[in-house]
From Swiss-Prot:
Taxonomy of the source species: Bacteria, Pseudomonadati, Pseudomonadota, Gammaproteobacteria, Enterobacterales
Keyword annotations: Ribosome biogenesis
Name listed for the protein in its UniProt record: Large ribosomal RNA subunit accumulation protein YceD
Functional note: Plays a role in synthesis, processing and/or stability of 23S rRNA.
Organism of provenance: Escherichia coli (strain K12)
Gene it is expressed from: yceD
Listed Pfam families: YceD
UniProt entry tagged with the keyword Ribonucleoprotein: no
Family named by the database record: Belongs to the DUF177 domain family.
GO BP: ribosome biogenesis
UniProt cross-references to NCBIfam families, sorted A to Z: PRK11193.1
Length: 173
């Protein structure tokens, strides 16, 4: 399949009325906010989007995005590659009242003063939300072993004497 660059903005209502589908990419240079959240963006962001009008006459955008990124393991500090995949379902709104009236299945996405949505920002937001909160290797690939991870009580050598024990002995006198 030929890699086609996706538009940055478009009118979702007109696109939904035409029932258009898009398949294409955003390059790693375009997804600057994703790049700030990870060590590196290793592949193009592959997206597919489908626009339609539902039974309630709402414009609907269904789609998915996937990208390979490098994250830093929070256990051992070493980089590792991670495949991010996300799906989304949006309906364009102009106001908070319209957003409140949307069915639960749809997420609201605000249109600008020209009636367009920022597709790149929407895809970036969804990828950032799909990133792990605490990125870690799988246990078998991480250099930090289970024995190195201490949970619960600290070992005896790590416990220090109470500095206020002297005051407690003076109080007894």
């Amino acid at each position: 399949m030929q890699k086609v660059k996706l538009p940055l903005t478009l009118d979702p209502v007109r696109t939904a009325q035409k029932r258009l589908d898009y398949q294409g990419i955003y390059t790693p240079d375009q997804v600057e906010r994703v790049a700030e959240s990870v060590v590196s963006v290793d592949s193009d962001v592959e997206c597919s989007m489908s626009f339609a009008i539902d039974n309630q006459r709402l414009a609907v955008l269904n789609g998915d995005a996937k990208v390979t990124v490098t994250l830093e393991c929070q256990r051992c500090g070493k980089p590792f590659t991670h495949q991010v995949y996300t799906t989304y379902c949006f309906s364009p709104v102009r106001s908070d009242e319209q957003a409140e009236a949307l069915p639960e299945a749809y997420e609201p996405i605000e249109v600008n003063e020209f009636g367009e949505i920022d597709l790149l920002a929407m895809v970036e937001d969804e990828i950032i939300l799909a990133l792990p909160v605490v990125p870690v290797h799988d246990s078998e690939h991480c250099e930090v072993s289970e024995a190195d991870m201490v949970f619960g009580e600290l070992p005896e050598e790590a416990q220090k004497p109470n500095p206020f024990a002297v005051l407690a002995s003076l109080k007894r006198k």
